[in-house]
């Protein structure tokens, strides 16, 4: 590794006519160098095979267009500390950015759209930051898979994806944080989270097929999320998941249950759950020894809380039925009309 800055490290100007993969592999690029991309349309796939390379857009007009023929726009195979910042990526047949193995990458402020696979895919990698990216019309917006751990997914926007907005898939994908992201109008889930000790905090999930799925693991935490307008299910905890904490979330105007818990030893605490179309909280037949405490439930039909499980503890919840002639659909349809502009605005990015 080079340690003496001016003698070894460089800012290298790059144009669309240059083969970036070949440039990185050449003796002209060393660890720690910055590739400063001139504005223009780049038709190429870039494999970054050296550590600590920073690939930075010089302006907003840096566009990587795969023209529906190239696979991944950027491939980071078993390298460390790569930064990709400020690039528009569109029309690739695989993923916008694929991280395989390695660790410590920074994926920041990119706009990724129209991938056949995923916006950002992280495979068997750890300690990555995925921050302030806007992802539209991919399969999953951000996918963590095959034992990806200790990743930070913060302030990203995923809209109109064919799969999930954000996903940590299967039990080995643990110790990840999803904070202040927006998932809007995705076909499947806003957040599909498998694994242990994951954090879901202050995310906004609007008009997705389903809001949140929690499966295969234990000890994950969800605090301060807003879930509204789901069609298939809202917040589902699967049988066999232990010690999940759901606290301080706002769950309103969803077609099915506000929270469906089929797991064991969960804590459902101080949530606001209102105007959902198929119970506020459903404790399924496999649920056992869960604590449901200090929640506020308003006009969920047919019941605010439906306990079908074993030895669940329901304490100090505030429950209010619907007013006469009031239904969730009436209230939610009015709210949707009034809030339409704010929802559309939220899909444009994180301020």
PLM features per residue range, with description:
Residues 350-351:
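Short acidic DE-rich linear segments
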Residues 21, 25-30, 41-56, 63-104, ...:
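Extracellular beta-strand-rich solenoid/capping regions of secreted or surface-exposed proteins
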Residues 279, 283-330, 334-343:
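Leucine-rich solenoid repeat scaffolds
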Residues 33:
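Glycine-centered, small-residue-biased loops immediately flanking beta-strands
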Residues 1-24:
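Right-handed parallel beta-helix/beta-solenoid
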Residues 30, 50-51, 59, 78-79, ...:
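Parallel beta-helix/beta-solenoid
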Residues 42-48, 60-73, 93-98, 116-123, ...:
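Short glycine/acidic-rich loop motifs that flank beta-strands on beta-rich extracellular proteins
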């Amino acid at each position: 590794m080079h340690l003496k800055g001016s003698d070894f490290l460089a800012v290298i100007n790059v144009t669309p006519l240059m083969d970036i993969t070949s440039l990185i592999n050449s003796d002209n690029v060393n660890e720690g160098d910055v590739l400063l991309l001139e504005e223009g349309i780049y038709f190429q796939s870039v494999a970054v095979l050296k550590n600590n390379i920073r690939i930075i857009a010089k302006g907003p007009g840096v566009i990587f267009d795969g023209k529906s023929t190239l696979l991944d726009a950027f491939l980071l195979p078993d390298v460390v500390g790569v930064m990709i910042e400020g690039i528009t990526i569109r029309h690739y047949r695989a993923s916008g950015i694929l991280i395989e193995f390695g660790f410590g990458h920074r994926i920041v402020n990119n706009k990724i759209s129209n991938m056949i696979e995923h916006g950002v895919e992280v495979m068997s990698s750890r300690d990555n930051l995925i921050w302030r990216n806007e992802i539209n019309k991919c399969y999953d917006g951000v996918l963590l898979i095959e034992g990806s751990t200790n990743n930070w997914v913060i302030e990203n926007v995923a809209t109109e994806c064919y799969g999930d907005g954000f996903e940590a898939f299967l039990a080995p994908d643990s110790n990840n944080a999803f904070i202040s992201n927006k998932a809007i109008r995705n076909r499947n889930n806003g957040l599909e989270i498998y694994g242990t000790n994951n954090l879901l905090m202050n995310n906004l999930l609007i008009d997705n097929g389903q809001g949140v799925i929690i499966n295969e693991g234990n000890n994950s935490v969800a605090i301060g999320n807003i879930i509204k307008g789901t069609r298939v299910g809202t917040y589902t905890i699967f049988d066999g998941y232990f010690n999940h904490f759901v606290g301080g979330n706002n769950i309103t105007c969803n077609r099915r249950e506000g929270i469906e818990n089929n797991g064991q030893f969960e804590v459902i605490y101080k949530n606001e759950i209102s105007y959902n179309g198929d119970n506020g909280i459903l404790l399924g037949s496999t649920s056992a020894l869960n604590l449901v405490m200090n929640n506020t439930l308003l006009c969920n039909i047919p019941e605010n809380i439906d306990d079908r499980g074993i030895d669940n503890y329901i304490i100090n919840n505030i429950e209010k039925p619907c007013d006469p002639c009031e239904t969730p659909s009436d209230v939610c349809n009015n709210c949707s009309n009034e809030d339409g502009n704010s929802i559309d605005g939220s899909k444009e990015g994180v301020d």
